[in-house]
């Protein structure tokens, strides 16, 4: 396991229910119909140019996106097992839920079949057994209220650690779980995959198997970190426990890029030792729409305090650095921890609120992480993600970069949707789970950086995703469970 402090970076620069068979030119020997595929009558099939096709297949980003000749929406688990039809006909396919995946390998699927799991959005909490059961199409927004209203929270199994859900309300829950599942409460809650108890999974040959510590335990190891390579998860069971704290403190601040150095100095104070209850998302973006422009009542004049008049220079609203903090404890402690930053940076706008944990995702980052924001609206837009890892914050690099980035998006209107993120979460609870327990390899990462930019390094991708120490075991699992490599379009594992 890597012991250096690593900071991963990223940039973002059917006719429904068709009854008649359709022979597609791409697959002339396989007529596509409910009966021929073996689907139940409540399932649906969509074709290009048919009713509902665009809404069925449109993705959050159209950059390097897969394309489909047909989309199937199964109604029951038994319908998903008919994936054997696609494998028999050599039809490349991809299961989808929130449709937020942005990995460039997705573009290798062209004129294939989408298996839409949106009918599987069932959520149930068993308060006596302390379990949460979700369908394969569930989004994070589907579980916030049921878990909270049951007086429960998600925790890692076999420990007393809490585990938080993600930062985007409309993103599917299963895919992040299979990749590990970091979140804003990772310091106190750990990663989502550590509390996964079992899944029901459809394999490439159409078999429905249970995967847990007791059944197919070796595969269970691989699912938690590289799960998209082995099958389609149609149901997952998580550990939950009694709610320990109903509310958290949300702290949002806006600064100009003149304060980039002060922000980086502040983050560097914590490094890999971020307090467990504290986390930050830093967003550098052109913010006119987000803040409503000059005169926003949340604006702060550094010399005269909060202002409702147009006292802030317009240039400060064109590009800004947003610091969105979260503290899972008393507000007084949170404000004490933020004091060094506020003493050294010029505040433009702030919002401090104490919110129920199940509403945090809607309040954070000035309300930009809820249903109507970056992750949950504007599908079909060109968005590309660059990712990497660094050992430390280099102040001069960030100061120079954000100045240049701000100038670029301010003067080029077509680029104003680009955002640079730093996600600095505590890994306190993440590191308490031994590295060998799952395929997830990056428990020692300090922060995540996201940038809207197109880049890929296929030669090193598997090492970046899974690490040299995990790949041999993962490749053996791949040969055992998917020897034909049909699950190869999202963070794929090669078998050699």
Curated annotation (Swiss-Prot):
The keyword Oxidoreductase applies. Its cofactor is FAD. One of its GO terms (molecular function) is FAD binding. Induction: Expression is up-regulated during co-cultivation of A.fumigatus with Streptomyces rapamycinicus that triggersthe production of the polyketide fumigermin during the bacterial-fungal interaction. Residues 64-243 form the FAD-binding PCMH-type domain. The keyword rRNA-binding does not apply. Gene3D superfamilies: 3.30.465.10, 3.40.462.20. Transmembrane segments: none annotated. Keywords: FAD, Flavoprotein, Glycoprotein, Oxidoreductase, Signal. It comes from the Eukaryota. Glycans are attached at residues 49, 122, 205, 258, 344, 351, 371, 382. Its EC number is 1.-.-.-. InterPro entries: BBE (IPR012951), FAD-bd_PCMH (IPR016166), FAD-bd_PCMH-like_sf (IPR036318), FAD-bd_PCMH_sub2 (IPR016169), FAD-linked_Oxidoreductase (IPR050416), Oxid_FAD_bind_N (IPR006094). Residues 1-21 form the signal peptide. Belongs to the oxygen-dependent FAD-linked oxidoreductase family. FAD-linked oxidoreductase; part of the gene cluster that mediates the biosynthesis of fumigermin that inhibits germination of spores of the inducing S.rapamycinicus, and thus helps the fungus to defend resources in the shared habitat against a bacterial competitor. The partially reducing polyketide synthase fngA alone is sufficient for the production of fumigermin. FgnA catalyzes the condensation of 3 malonyl-CoA units to an acetyl-CoA starter, and 3 methylations to yield fumigermin. This is FAD-linked oxidoreductase AFUA_1G00980.
């Amino acid at each position: 396991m890597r012991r250096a402090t690593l900071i991963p970076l990223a940039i973002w620069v059917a006719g429904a229910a068709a009854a008649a068979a359709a022979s597609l030119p791409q697959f002339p020997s396989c007529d596509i119909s409910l009966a021929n595929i073996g689907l139940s009558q409540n399932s649906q099939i969509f074709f290009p140019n048919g009713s509902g096709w665009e809404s069925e297949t449109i993705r959050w980003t159209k950059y390097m996106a897969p394309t489909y000749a047909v989309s199937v929406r199964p109604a029951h688990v038994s319908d998903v097992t008919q994936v054997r039809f696609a494998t028999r006909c050599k039809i490349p396919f991809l299961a989808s839920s929130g449709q937020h995946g942005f990995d460039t390998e997705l573009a290798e699927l062209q004129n294939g079949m989408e298996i839409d799991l949106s009918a599987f959005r069932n959520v149930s909490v068993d308060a006596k057994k302390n379990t949460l059961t979700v369908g394969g199409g569930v989004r994070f927004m589907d579980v916030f209220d049921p878990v909270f209203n049951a007086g429960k929270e998600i925790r890692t199994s076999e420990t007393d650690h809490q585990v938080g859900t993600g930062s985007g309300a409309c993103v599917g829950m299963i895919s992040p779980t299979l990749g590990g599942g970091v979140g804003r409460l990772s310091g106190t809650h750990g990663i989502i995959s550590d509390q996964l108890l079992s899944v029901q999974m459809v394999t490439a040959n159409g078999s429905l198997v249970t995967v847990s510590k007791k059944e197919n335990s070796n595969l269970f190891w691989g699912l938690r970190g590289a799960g998209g390579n082995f099958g389609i998860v149609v149901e997952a069971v998580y550990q939950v426990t009694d709610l320990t704290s109903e509310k958290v403190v949300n702290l949002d601040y806006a600064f100009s890029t003149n304060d980039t150095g002060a922000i980086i100095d502040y983050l560097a104070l914590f490094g890999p030792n971020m307090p467990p209850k504290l986390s930050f998302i830093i967003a550098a973006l052109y913010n006119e729409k987000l803040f409503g422009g000059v005169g926003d009542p949340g604006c702060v004049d550094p010399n005269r305090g909060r202002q409702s008049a147009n006292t802030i220079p317009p240039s400060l609203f064109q590009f800004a650095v947003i610091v969105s903090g979260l503290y899972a404890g008393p507000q007084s402690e949170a404000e004490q921890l933020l004091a060094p930053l506020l003493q050294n940076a010029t505040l433009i706008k702030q919002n401090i609120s104490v919110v129920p944990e199940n509403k945090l995702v809607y309040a954070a980052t000035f309300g930009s992480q809820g249903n109507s924001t970056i992750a949950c609206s504007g599908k079909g837009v060109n968005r590309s993600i660059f990712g990497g890892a660094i050992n430390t914050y280099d102040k001069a690099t960030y100061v120079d970069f954000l100045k240049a980035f701000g100038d670029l998006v301010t003067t080029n209107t077509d680029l104003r949707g680009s955002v640079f993120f730093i996600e600095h979460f505590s890994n306190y609870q993440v590191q308490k789970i031994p590295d060998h327990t799952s395929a997830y390899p990056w428990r020692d990462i300090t922060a995540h950086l996201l940038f809207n930019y197109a880049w890929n390094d296929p030669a090193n991708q598997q090492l970046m995703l899974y690490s040299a120490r995990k790949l041999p075991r993962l490749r053996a699992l791949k040969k055992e469970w998917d020897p034909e490599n049909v699950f190869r379009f999202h963070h794929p594992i090669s078998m050699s």
